[in-house]
Amino acid sequence: MDEAARVGEAGFDFAEINLLHPHQAFQEIPSLLRIKEQHKFFYLVHGPEEGSPFDCARLRASLLPQIKTLVAFASELEARIITAHFWLDERYIQPPVLREKLAILEEMLMLAREKQTAFCLENLSERACDFEPAFRHFPDLGMTLDIGHGELLSPENTAYRFIETFPDRIRHIHIHDNRGGNSPGDDLHLPLGEGSINFPPILSALVQSGYDGTITLEVPPHLFVQQREKLLTMLSSAQNRG
């Protein structure tokens, strides 16, 4: 809640609320609505951690109820987008598990449809080909493209192929820096420019694809304003190159 107020005071158009424990968040709704009205912005909502990505029984028993609560919370705030982690990397998850996960994902989407809220999956280590079955099965499934995650476990940032292959599915962007790597510990969430990600060509590809949606800076809160100016400069350059 404090971070939402800080985002509003800095003049941002929206705040993305990260809900690690959705069931505990409802008591904050009145305060969050006051902040929204005060600063005339809107909300996006980010869901809880998936837990074990291989245990479908646990996902049904634990994650699905959390997603149901998350959707209800987002609806109360009139949040425009819900983002969830739901790992679909075919290199590590066996086909029978992936098939069951698609069935679980369909149930998540049904919950979001009931509240008329856009539902997006965020890429972790996945490549574009890993999202293809989900996009093929579910025409209304969106994507939150995490450019920082795209730098991990890949010789080339996976954002390029996502933008090339599924530009119409990208509804939101997460941006932060890192130095590449092959483990969760390499997901450093550094300020832009403090890692090794080459942002200008990625942003140029994004601009050329026609994307004009929201971008969340996933960097330390005290750097929000400074990083916003840096990002706006890079986006302006990308538009000029386009």
Where are these regions (language model features)?
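Histidine-acidic metal/acid-base catalytic patches
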Residues: D2-G8, E78, A128-A134, F138-L145, ...
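Acidic-and-aromatic substrate-binding clefts and catalytic sites of carbohydrate-active enzymes
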Residues: M1-D2, I17-S31, G51-A61, E90-I93, ...
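N-terminal pre-domain/capping segments
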Residues: M1-T69, S75, G142, N240-G242
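Charged helix-capping and loop-helix junction motifs
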Residues: E28-L33, L59-K68, V97-E106, P155-E164, ...
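Active-site acidic/histidine proton-transfer and metal-coordination neighborhood
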Residues: C56-G142
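Helix C-cap/helix->beta junction micro-motif
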Residues: E37-H39, L77, K115, S209-Y211
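Alpha-helix-loop-beta-strand connector modules within alpha/beta enzyme cores
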Residues: L33-G51, L102-E114, F199-S204
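Hydrophobic faces of well-ordered beta-strands that scaffold small-molecule active sites
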Residues: A15-I17, Y43-G47, I82-A84, F119-L121, ...
